[in-house]
Amino acid sequence: MAPSPIMPRYHVGPMASTRRAISKKGFPRTRSFPVLTAPLDYLRDSPGKDIRSGLTDAFNEFLCVPEDKVVTIKRIIDLLHNASLLIDDIQDDSKLRRGVPVAHSIFGIAQTINSANLAYFLAQQELKKLSNPDAFAIYTDELINLHRGQGMELHWRESLHCPTEEEYMRMVQNKTGGLFRLAIRLLQGESRSDRDYVPLVDTLGTLFQIRDDYQNLQSDVYSKNKGFCEDISEGKFSYPVIHSIRARPGDLRLLNILKQRSEDLMVKQYAVSYINSTGSFEFCRGKIDCLAQWANLQLAALEEAEGAGRGDKLRAVLRLLDMKASGKQADVAS
């Protein structure tokens, strides 16, 4: 029988959907339709500092998971992290990511969203390589947390509602902590250890986000990679912004600047000066120092229980996040 002129010669089904080429970085790409992953591949070509991968390796010093499982978990986290950045940049109307134009300015919004969504399912597909029967439930749980946190942050921005510090911390535990926790929970599921490392992971996630908020408004490195004070242009209620607004509840200047979503350099410089005048950057640095000290205490307790020397890699990550140790310009951006 002659092939139908309106039907393709290839079969698209479960087997066809899993045939993938492997990129030079070891991550799956779609063989037949590279356009599907083009926005994702574009973002990967300008890699970040990959702190999540470093954390996975560091925690595995305690958990001793086989290397093939670690590689799979790191692949899952990389796919999800980059997918979330593609979506974040659209939602925030960002202009730069890692020093280059954002993906949707090259490939368009629709194609970028589709590529990000595809990455979620490519990551989900990798779960089959893990031994833990609860891996899918863990994956779903933390992706729900991630979207819950992201949703609250978007709600505050769109409604011009300044959250409390407690609300902010809860959001960070969900949004930033989600992928941190996912990596370690998947590792724990492949390990013989029954010790819970999630409390330390939660501390690190909060430390990372508050430090990121601070750097966005204070770091020359961040300005180069993401634009000057991008959080102000986004109208984002970051940690120093929340403290500054609540330090002077009767003064609406900063709240109104956020409302404008201004790209004006002078306006953003004024906002930074205002935030500094309320002592909010100093307060932020104090919080970062406090979280770093608490993380070091948690790590010391783990080493005491599990054996000295196992925390060396984690301690190196902490030095990177500790602004006193690394210097405030150190770049750990996404």
UniProtKB/Swiss-Prot annotation:
Give the cofactor note: Binds 3 Mg(2+) ions per subunit.
Species of the source: Claviceps paspali
Reactions performed catalytically: isopentenyl diphosphate + dimethylallyl diphosphate = (2E)-geranyl diphosphate + diphosphate; isopentenyl diphosphate + (2E)-geranyl diphosphate = (2E,6E)-farnesyl diphosphate + diphosphate; isopentenyl diphosphate + (2E,6E)-farnesyl diphosphate = (2E,6E,10E)-geranylgeranyl diphosphate + diphosphate
SUPFAM superfamilies, sorted? Terpenoid synthases
Q: Which residues bind dimethylallyl diphosphate?
A: R97, K175, T176, Q209, N216, K226, K236
Q: Where is this site: Important for determining product chain length?
A: Y120
The record's gene field reads idtG
Amino-acid positions noted as binding isopentenyl diphosphate in the UniProt annotation, renumbered to this chain:
K49, R52, H81, R98
Q: What is this protein called?
A: Geranylgeranyl pyrophosphate synthase idtG
For biological process, the GO terms are: alcohol biosynthetic process; isoprenoid biosynthetic process; mycotoxin biosynthetic process
